[in-house]
């Protein structure tokens, strides 16, 4: 079950990448994992925002501030880059935005918001690590 859910989430997240990602990712062609990690440089964690489990699920941005953090903005991504970071880890907790009919379909508005956050990070010239987080229910 866990394997199938991971595959499903991967397929659903493919559209999250900006259309230009294929063109930009060609820079990594021929690089070893160690070389890519070196390119990624220092990272910053956007924790306790999209992985928070509080807030009203009617508003897909409500959870960002439910654990006391500021709202995610394009300016935040620019500040992260200006502070000297090259990579951002974006942990996301999905279960609050999935259907309860057994299909685990992720709400389109939440997927769109995740896409928006990833695009802001990419526009700030950050590598993005999109992390599935707080999903113990998958077991």
Residue locations for each model-derived region?
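Sec-dependent signal peptide cleavage junction
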Residues: 15-24
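A short, compositionally biased domain-edge/stem linker segment
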Residues: 23-33
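Positively charged n-region of N-terminal signal peptides that target proteins for export
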Residues: 1-7
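Active-site mouth of glycoside hydrolases
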Residues: 31, 37-139
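Bacterial N-terminal signal peptides
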Residues: 7-16
